[in-house]
Structure formats: C-alpha cells, structure tokens
C-alpha cells in the first residue's frame, strides 16, 4: 500500500494542474514553507540542514524542512552536494532560484506595505526595495559566485550580501 501511495504521489508531483505559468511557479515553490527555505539559503547563507533548522524564524519542523529540501531539489531550485560519509550535505541555489531575487524583493515590499512586520525582520526587505533592480542584479551576481562558482564581481565597497547581513545584525 505504501509503495502504491508513493507512486501516486510521484505521478501527481510530475503532472501540472494546467499549462499556466503562474500555476507552474506555484507548484514549484508556492507552499507555505518553500519560499522561506529559499529565503534562508539566499539571504541567510544557510546551506546545511542544521543551519536551516536552527536559524528558522518561523520554527520549521525537521520533517517539514527535510520534505521541502527534497521538493526544492526535485524542482531544480536547489542542488544537494553529498559530502560523503560523516559529512554534512550542502545545499546551493540554482540559476532558477537566483532569478527569484526580484520576486523576493517584490514580496518583501508588499509585506512591508500591507502586513505588520518587526524592525529586525524588515530591514532586508527595505534595503532591497530601496536599491531596486540595480541592487538585485548585484545580489544575483554575488549569489552566482557563491552558489554556481561563477567569477565574483569586482568590489570596491562591501558586497550586497555583506551590507544586508550588517543591516540585519544592527537591527537585532
């Protein structure tokens, strides 16, 4: 019976409800935890299961986190690097998830305008909103260097990632 349910679940996960691009996106990351996991990898530089679990502001349960990580890898939004026996597996963003930076910025800005937030947790959204597309492009280039191994952008000032981290720490 379990094997039959697993096969049915796999089939459902592979079949889209429709050919609508918004539906396709929602099916990839539209549940209540996937965007938060991606946020923590993207903005918190949490790359390991324990870091994601311990650093979750929303207190994600370990079984939910494990499930979402598997789904995000399956959807092509994260990669999982197996480090070998006794070592931790590292998760990395893919190009597809890095291209979600503008979506995160817009979601954050919407949340700032329409939902109550706390100072500490709103600081990154404020910076992304204020910086707009030029800042997003810089951040995406930095994320590509970290997660995809592309050449790091040349710097004469702190990186976007460093500035976001400093602002977050200062607001804490």
What kind of feature is each model-predicted range?
Residues 1-29:
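N-terminal leader segment of winged-helix/HTH proteins
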Residues 56-80, 86:
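Canonical helix-turn-helix DNA-binding module
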Residues 30, 84-107:
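Basic, amphipathic "hinge/linker" alpha-helix immediately C-terminal to the N-terminal HTH DNA-binding motif
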Residues 1-6, 104-172:
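C-terminal regulatory/oligomerization modules of transcriptional regulators
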Residues 6-9, 15-16, 33-38, 48-49, ...:
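Short histidine
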Residues 20-61:
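N-terminal helix-turn-helix DNA-binding core of bacterial DNA-binding proteins
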Residues 49, 76, 115-119:
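Short amphipathic alpha-helical interaction/hinge segments
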Residues 36, 40, 77-79, 106:
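Solvent-exposed, amphipathic alpha-helical segments
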